[in-house]
C-alpha cells in the first residue's frame, strides 16, 4: 500500500489579466501540463472574472518556491506570446 504524503505548504496565486478571455487562454495553455512531481505538488487552476487563479499544495517550502517560480516563468512566456500575436 502506498504511503500518503502530507502537503502542508499552500499558496494561492491570483494573476490579473486584461480580460476574462486572456485568463482563459492562459488556463488552456497551462492546464495540459502536469506537475513533474505530482506526489509532492497538487495544483488547481481556474478563472475568476479576469483573474487566473492557481492553488498549490506542496510538500515543502522549497518545492513551493520552485513550483511558483516555474509558474511565473511559464506565465511570462504565455503573456509575452499573446502580446506579440495580438500585434500581428
Curated annotation (Swiss-Prot):
Its quaternary structure?
Component of the EKC/KEOPS complex composed of at least of SPAP27G11.07c/BUD32, cgi121, gon7, pgp2 and SPAC4H3.13/PCC1; the whole complex dimerizes.
Q: Report the function annotation for this chain.
A: Component of the EKC/KEOPS complex that is required for the formation of a threonylcarbamoyl group on adenosine at position 37 (t(6)A37) in tRNAs that read codons beginning with adenine. The complex is probably involved in the transfer of the threonylcarbamoyl moiety of threonylcarbamoyl-AMP (TC-AMP) to the N6 group of A37. SPAC4H3.13/PCC1 functions as a dimerization module for the complex. The EKC/KEOPS complex also promotes both telomere uncapping and telomere elongation. The complex is required for efficient recruitment of transcriptional coactivators.
Q: Which family does it belong to?
A: Belongs to the CTAG/PCC1 family.
- Gene Ontology biological-process entries: tRNA threonylcarbamoyladenosine metabolic process; tRNA threonylcarbamoyladenosine modification
GO terms for CC? chromosome, telomeric region; cytosol; EKC/KEOPS complex; nucleus
Name residues in a coiled coil. Answer: none
Q: Which organism is it from?
A: Schizosaccharomyces pombe (strain 972 / ATCC 24843) (Fission yeast)
Subcellular compartments? Cytoplasm; Nucleus; Chromosome, Telomere
Indicate what this protein is called per its UniProt record: EKC/KEOPS complex subunit SPAC4H3.13
Any matching Pfam family: Pcc1
Primary location class: cytoplasm
Q: Which Gene3D superfamilies match?
A: Alpha-D-phosphohexomutase, C-terminal domain
Q: Which keywords, in A-to-Z order, does the entry hold?
A: Activator, Chromosome, Cytoplasm, Nucleus, Telomere, Transcription, Transcription regulation, tRNA processing
